[in-house]
Amino acid sequence: MEKLGKYELAGSLTNQNAGYSVWGFGKKNGKDYFIKQFVEQKYPANDTVSSPERLAKKIKACERFEQRKKALYQMLNENSDGNAVRVEEFFRIESKYYISMRKIESLHWDFTDVAKLPSGEIRRLCAIIAHGVASLHKGRMIHADLKPDNVLFMKTDAGYTTAKIIDFDSGFLETDPPGPGETIVGDFHYFSPEACRSIWGEEVELTCKMDIFALGVLFHQYFTSELPGFNTDESTYSGEAAAKGEVLAVSDKLPNDIRELLKQMLNNDPTQRPTAMEVFNSLRGIVPSVTPETHNVVHNDDTPAHDDVVVHSPVIEASTTSSNPFFRPGDL
């Protein structure tokens, strides 16, 4: 069986539905993990061709990549409510960077499967997702790629269905958004209007409210199997239409309370959208049994707390190790 550091791989890594990465599954200490390799960023470990100036530039870019990922994953692991799946490890082997997370035994649902559920169950699942996003936003972390593929559904030991948010690699902190020349990565169908304007070259503030718009689109699909309405002759995507000033049409099939909530979440002005916790509280009011403490809402995974997550050397050399245990070097 092929090995990757401490992991025994279940098969070759693949790029199916993976964007700028390849992924697969592996086992470590008897537990199953999802493993992702970042394709675009490579450390010049064996670069004997580049000039000293070019090599220094490559190393600096890698250091920036590492710093951003560590900060992002640290914030995720410190703030997750258990339904935003924590990162087990972020590490490098030779020139390639990887992360690992506990494998989720998902139900393989898409939004059309969710839409077939009773309305009360859809509301409960949306509340779980909103609470998970609120836990990220508590640390001012933006997921930036909320879409059906990045929300998995699974059964808990008690038999409830819960939701798990995955794939944070398009994410960033509000304090460190993509700069000039950097790309916002994600699915255009769920881009907020401000993300679209940023791509068009406008100067805009990118905040956690980006995720609220994406949730508005996603929740609309969960309830109706359809995207919010807009003029498809003028725009291809919801956020694009909103960025051009169009008010998205929320389905008349929705109950009035859900309809009004989605209208707020899809507001063209990010400052007028509710926070993720406000979305959760609205849904909790609609489903009185929903509380952040109940296991049918927040099903804590058994992935490690942030002080168990390691960043392996040679990403961090022992002589420069931070006192923060998230940056503790390990051995591969």
Question: Regions from the language model: what does each represent?
Answer:
Residues 181-198:
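Conserved activation segment of eukaryotic-like protein kinases, specifically the C-terminal portion
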Residues 21-70:
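ATP-binding glycine-rich loop module of kinase domains
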Residues 266-278:
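A conserved short helix/loop substructure at the end of the activation segment
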